[in-house]
């Protein structure tokens, strides 16, 4: 436990990670740009509300402007910020990462593509995360996913199973279950496909995950977005990695069959947690930018690169822009707008 660890971006996911590693006895600091959250953690520690328990961690929290006061560089940086903040945060933390240190983007999207060139690919380890949480009150995080159900997939960008990967596995087991993969980009693409189905679409519709089957036409929209995303991934030559407890056999069928299986599996998981709100919906409620551009928007950009049409994903991006601009509110009425844009 002698490794120095920074959790960079301590919103909902970062707060959960930072609390667990602190409670496990690691040398860890939490860094964030939300002043009230940092001040609350400095004064009272961090409260983590689980479905059946409440935990407290006496964390070490720092404002971004205080990082320059830290005396030693970090062995490990767990970047848990929004995807659209990845580039500048990677530049920001680069001087504070040891030459032989490692940065792990514990985020949605394909962040390694733009983080690795900044810090060096040899210092980047890929990660896929399955953990739902939200934070609206400074110093208090609602963790929706219990430890035994949370999951992290870790992998070297070159596909190797290395000693540092084993070390990260041991560390992250304090937060949830961990798997090591030799196909981390395939796993990240699977998560991107699922995110393109769920986060943006359900966010603009103002729906929780379990409500996806309650409104006619919504599940079909999700499957349409996911099918486009998987077609893009396959056109670009990625081998999709099974996650969410699915097997290789579940991913062996046609693109549409695989996406339907993935969508139904995730929605079924959502029915077990009716208080869970997707991160895009949380962002709308907070009045801030969503990650939809880094998810569905990335699918649209990659689709152009692969010559694969992505009208459903493009529609989600457009409605997200309209909501962020104040032209409309998230809600079920946006389904008609999405269908109009898709044509």
Regions of interest found by a model, annotated:
Residues 57-97:
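Rossmann-like NAD(P)-binding element
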Residues 2, 223-343:
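NAD(P)-dependent Rossmann-like dehydrogenase/reductase catalytic/cofactor-binding core
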């Amino acid at each position: 436990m002698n490794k120095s660890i920074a959790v960079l971006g301590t919103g909902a996911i970062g707060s959960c990670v930072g609390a667990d590693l602190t409670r496990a006895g690691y040398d860890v600091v939490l860094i964030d740009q939300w002043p009230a959250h940092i001040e609350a953690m400095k004064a009272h520690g961090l409260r983590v509300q689980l479905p059946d328990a409440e935990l407290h961690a006496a964390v070490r929290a720092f404002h971004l402007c205080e990082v320059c006061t830290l005396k030693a560089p970090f062995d490990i940086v767990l970047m848990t910020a929004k995807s659209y903040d990845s580039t500048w945060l990677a530049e920001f933390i680069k001087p504070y990462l040891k030459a032989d240190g490692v940065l792990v983007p514990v985020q949605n999207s394909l962040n390694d593509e733009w983080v690795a060139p900044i810090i060096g690919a040899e210092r980047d380890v890929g990660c896929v995360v399955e953990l739902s949480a939200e934070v609206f009150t400074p110093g208090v995080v609602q963790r929706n996913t219990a430890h035994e159900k949370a999951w992290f997939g870790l992998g070297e960008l070159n596909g190797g199973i290395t000693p540092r990967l084993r070390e990260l596995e041991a560390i992250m087991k304090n937060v949830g279950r961990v798997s090591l993969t030799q196909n981390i980009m395939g796993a990240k693409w699977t998560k991107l496909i699922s995110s393109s189905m769920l986060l943006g679409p359900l966010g603009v519709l103002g729906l929780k995950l379990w409500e996806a089957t309650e409104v006619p036409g919504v599940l079909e929209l999700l499957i349409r977005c996911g099918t486009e995303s998987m077609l893009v991934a396959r056109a670009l030559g990625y081998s999709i990695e099974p996650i969410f407890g699915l097997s290789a056999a579940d991913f062996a069928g046609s693109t549409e069959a695989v996406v339907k299986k993935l969508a139904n599996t995730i929605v079924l998981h959502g029915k077990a947690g009716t208080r869970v709100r997707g991160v895009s919906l949380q962002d709308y409620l907070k009045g801030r930018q969503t990650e939809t551009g880094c998810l569905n928007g990335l699918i649209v950009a990659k689709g152009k690169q692969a010559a694969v049409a992505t009208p459903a994903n493009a529609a989600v991006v457009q409605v997200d822009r309209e909501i962020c601009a104040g032209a409309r509110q998230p809600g079920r009425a946006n389904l008609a707008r999405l269908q109009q844009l898709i044509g």
